[in-house]
Structures are given as C-alpha cells and as structure tokens.
C-alpha cells in the first residue's frame, strides 16, 4: 500500500545520499592525502 511505497522511497533516498556522501568522503580523503585540498 501507500506505506510500503513510502518506506521504499525513504530507503532509496537514503541509499543515494549514502553513496553521494561516501563518494565525497573518499574524494576528500584523497585530496587530503595528496595535500591538494
């Protein structure tokens, strides 16, 4: 029903945000490691 659609959307959004944050974090660590921030 509506609720399962809603929770599915929340989960998908969370996954996307987590991926984006992970990518940004990795890039930040890489620039820190090479002193290019």
UniProtKB/Swiss-Prot annotation:
Name the keywords, alphabetized. Answer: Amphibian defense peptide, Antibiotic, Antimicrobial, Disulfide bond, Fungicide, Secreted
Q: Which residues form the signal peptide?
A: none
Q: Which cysteines are joined by disulfide bonds?
A: 31-37
Domain of life of the native organism: Eukaryota
* Record's GO cellular component terms: extracellular region
Q: Name one GO biological process term.
A: defense response to fungus
Question: Where in the cell is the protein located?
Answer: Secreted
**Tissue localization of expression:** Expressed by the skin glands.
Q: What does this protein do?
A: Antibacterial activity against Gram-positive bacterium S.aureus and Gram-negative bacterium E.coli. Has activity against C.albicans.
Stated family: Belongs to the frog skin active peptide (FSAP) family. Esculentin subfamily.
Q: What is this protein called?
A: Esculentin-2L
Output the lineage of the source organism: Eukaryota, Metazoa, Chordata, Craniata, Vertebrata
């Amino acid at each position: 029903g509506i609720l399962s659609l809603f929770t599915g959307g929340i989960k998908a959004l969370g996954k996307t945000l987590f991926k984006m944050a992970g990518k940004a974090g990795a890039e930040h660590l890489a620039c820190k490691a090479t002193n290019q921030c």
